Each structure stands twice: as C-alpha cells, then as structure tokens.
Amino acid sequence: MLCSLLLCGCLLLITGYAHDDDWIDPTDMLNYDAASGTMRKSQAKYGTSEKKEVNPGLSDAQELSDCLQRLDSLTHKVDDCEKKKMKDYESQSNPVFRRYLNKILIEAGKLGLPDEDRVDVRYDAEILLTRQTLLEIQKFLSGEEWKPGALDDALSDILTNFKSHDAEAWKWQFEDYFGVDPYNVFMVLLCLLCIVALVATELWTYVRWHTQLKRVCIISFLVSLGWNWIYLYKVAFAQHQANVAKMAPLNDVCAKKMDWTENLWEWFRISWTYKDDPCQKYYELLIVNPIWLVPPTKALAVTFTNFVTEPLKYIGKGTGEFIKALMKEIPVLLQIPVLVILALAVLGFCYGAGQSVPMLRHFRGPEREPPRALEPDDRRRQKELDYRFHGGAGDADFSYRGPAGSIEQGPYDKMHVCERDVLRQRQVNMRFPSGNKSPEVLRAFDLPDTEAQEHPEVVPSHKPSIVNTSLKETSELPRESTLAECSQCAKDGSGQVPSTAESSPIVEKAQLKTDSECRPHSTEAAAAAARGTDPVSSPCG
C-alpha cells in the first residue's frame, strides 16, 4: 500500500514537469481561452525570458548585451499586450454601435428613407438620458472598464419618439404658448401699424371722415366680390365632385361602345319615356368645369344681395329676439297694446329722424348750394360775365365788343338795362367831374364778391368809364330820374350836346317813349357806326 502511494506521487511529479507549458496562470487574462479552458500560446518569441545563471567567467559587455535583449523582448511583449487589448476593445464596441445604427435605419425606414427624388430627409427624435446611461457613456469615453450589454441598453433607450421633421411645428408651439394663431397676430400688428402710420403722417387730417367711410365701403364691396366668387366656386366644385361620385356606376355603361341592339333599346327608351339620358349627365360632369358655373355676374348679384340683406338680417334677428323676450313676461291681453306702442315708437323715431336731417347736415360733409335763379335785371350781367370770361383785369370794354348771347330781351329787360347804364354814367360823372382820362373800374369777377361790392378799385385809363354797381342800388332809385338819364345817355351816344332849353322836351319824350329811345344794341350800334362814333361808349348798350 505504501509503495503504491509513492509510485503515484512520482508519476504526478513526472507529469507535472512534462506539461509545464500547459500550466494556467490565474492572473494572465489576456492569454486565457474561456472556451477551451487552457492558456493560449504566444505566436512569436522574441527571446528567452528565463533567467539564466550568471557565468562568472563572462565579461561586462556580454552581460550588458544580454540585458538589452531581455529588455527588448519585454518591450515587444508589452506592445503585443496593448494591441490585443485594443482588438478586444474594438471587437466588443463594434457590435454595440452596429446595433445602434441598425435601430436608426429601422425607425427611419418606417417614415421613408432618402432616394433619387429626395436627396435628404429630415427627422425629429427625442433623446432620453438617464443617470445610468450617462455613467456608461462616460466609462466608454474615458477608457475605463465598461460592459457592452449596459452600453447597448443605454444607447437603445436614448432615441425615442422618432418622427418626420415638421417645418410648421413652431406655429403649433407658438399657438400652444400664447393661445393665438401667428397669422392673426400678424394681421392685428399690421392694422396697428397702419393706424400708427395714419396718425404719424397726419394723413387722416386731409381726408374727411365721410370720404373715408365711402372708400371703406367701396373697398369692402370689391373685396367681397372676389371673396364670394371663390366661395361659390368652392361650393360648385364640391357639388361637382359629389355628382361624379354618384355617377361612378355609369362608368362602364357610358364608356363602352353600344351595338345595334343597345342602340335600338335606347331609341325605344327615348321615344316612349320622358326620362333624361344618364350618359348625357355623365358626360356633362366630365366635360364641364365647375368654374364655368360661377360667372362674375352671379358673384356680383350675391355680393350685392349680401351687402344689403345681411345687415338687415341681423337687425331683424335682434329685433325678433327682443320682442320675444319682451312678450314672454307680458300677459296675452296686453301683448297687442304693447305691439301698437312699439309700432308708434318706431314711427315717431322715423319722423324725428326725418325732421332732424337739416340739423345733421354738417355730418354729411360740404355740399354745393344750387345756383340762384337769375332775375330779369341780372340777365344782361350774366351775359357780360359769360362773355368776359376770357378777358383780363384791364379789358374794361372787352365785354361790349360783340354779341353777348342769343337770349332774347323784352321791352322791360331793355328798360332795366338802360337804367343800369345811366346809373353807371352818373356815378362816373360825380366821382370824376373833370379830366381827360376816365377811370377804369375792376369788375366783380376780378375781385372777391364782398370786396367788389364794398370797395371797388379804380385804375386810371383812356377807355370809356363803366362802373359796376349792385342791382339793389338800381332798384332803389326813382324811375323818373332814370328815364331822364336814359334820354341824356342817348344824346351823348349820338355825339350832340343840346342846350338846357332843348333838353326838357327830350326828357318828356324819353318818359313817354322809353322803348323807342333805348333801342336794341344792334340798331344803335349800326347808327353809331354810320356817324363814325364808337358804339362802346353808348351806355344804353
């Protein structure tokens, strides 16, 4: 028994020395193969690492060379260890990133990957970062010991809610934050800018409010015209699409060619029934565009109708609700008197508004007064003003050098004209009794109305003197003196200066025969031309 134990011990020692190379070093994790449970042998040997016994007979140079060889072998071993470590590091990290990129491609493939039509596609995703994920990423970046499984799970949980990129997302965020659509905010700011511009530039002071109101109404009507046309077109298009959907069963019936039996049957159907041809309606829907169903006249009619009836509709609706709420608490017997009182109140309001229109005239803006009707004495003055339109301020006798118009004058009109001319001559003689030069008076159309009536400006001139006076002064003078002056005017026009004794019968004759002495302008002008005198100087015209 003892001998057998000794024999087994010797065999174990022998086998131990025989398999010295297969000894497992528990601290060497680089050369350990976990699958086979043995140590991997090094592929290259750069020298003997065993410690050799120092031979005392060797020189120092040989010892130095041996040390350098051993140092070189150790350096190569360290490099090999680093390379193996890097390979293991890369071999462990590559699968992690491969799975991460594969997940990104899978999520993007659900939304659409770039192709020939779309060179680049934008996506949105949320990044979820936890504390454990942050620690694993920091270990990996710093080169510390890390676990591939933990890093893979961390990267897989980072990207969440993968979706396509929405360029209008900021609008929704703006609306969620402020509760208002960005377009409405922009329009309000634009209106405020317009108001500020009107106030700053004082443009509103140059345009009256009633003019602005009319322009706003016109612009609103024009905008509503296009607005209603688009609305009617949309409605017609929707109705057209609905009719096309209803005609879908007739696609095969109306599209195929008919043989002689079907043509015969169609002829009998048309001859014996009043039903419309469904294929005709089908082809009308296919050929006629809905845009031709909405002419501009229809849009204009709808716009005008809405422009007038829509306000009345809301007024009637409000009135009906008011009457309904008023009658709800009133007994049935009192409802009729209340309605009568309301009707009388409305009529009274309308009557009062009609009576207050002249008081509110200034709210309607400036209005031009109608031209005043000309009296008989003003006809010649109006003719002179019309004829003197092209004359200047110094053309005193310009208005008497031609016919003033085609208005016929009666005997009373001629008499009033003669009276006015006599008064003009009298005022000239009173204000300028001596001197060869006669004054020239600016007429009413050369000065403002008030200045021409109150302070006529006198300018010296060689032309005949004519003074414009108001018609009121003409009507206030006595008729006898006017007729006498008219006779004297006739004598002065003929170029003769009679004596005092001869003037009295002429005055009496002028009082009896006013029409004969104050002749028309054409007869006296011809007589003056025959005598060689200027017809302009005749005050009787």
From Swiss-Prot:
TM spans (from-to): 185-205, 218-238, 330-350
UniProt entry keywords in alphabetical sequence: Chloride, Chloride channel, Endoplasmic reticulum, Ion channel, Ion transport, Membrane, Phosphoprotein, Signal, Transmembrane, Transmembrane helix, Transport
Catalytic function, reaction form: chloride(in) = chloride(out); bromide(in) = bromide(out); nitrate(in) = nitrate(out); fluoride(in) = fluoride(out)
Membrane topology qualifier: Multi-pass membrane protein
Tissue expression pattern: Expressed in testis (spermatocytes), liver and lung (at protein level). Expressed in spleen, liver, testis, kidney, heart, brain and lung.
Pfam families for the chain: MCLC
GO biological process: chloride transport; endoplasmic reticulum calcium ion homeostasis
Record's GO cellular component terms: chloride channel complex; cytoplasm; endoplasmic reticulum; endoplasmic reticulum membrane; Golgi apparatus; membrane; mitochondria-associated endoplasmic reticulum membrane contact site; nucleus
Residue(s) carrying Phosphothreonine: T482
Subunit note: Homomultimers. Interacts with mitochondrial protein PIGBOS1 (via C-terminus); the interaction occurs at the mitochondria-associated endoplasmic reticulum (ER) membrane, a zone of contact between the ER and mitochondrial membranes, but does not appear to play a role in ER-mitochondria tethering and is not affected by ER stress. Interacts with CALR.
Protein purpose: Anion-selective channel with Ca(2+)-dependent and voltage-independent gating. Permeable to small monovalent anions with selectivity for bromide > chloride > nitrate > fluoride. Operates in the endoplasmic reticulum (ER) membrane where it mediates chloride efflux to compensate for the loss of positive charges from the ER lumen upon Ca(2+) release. Contributes to the maintenance of ER Ca(2+) pools and activation of unfolded protein response to prevent accumulation of misfolded proteins in the ER lumen.
Family affiliation: Belongs to the chloride channel MCLC family.
Protein name as catalogued: Chloride channel CLIC-like protein 1
The organism of origin for this protein: Rattus norvegicus
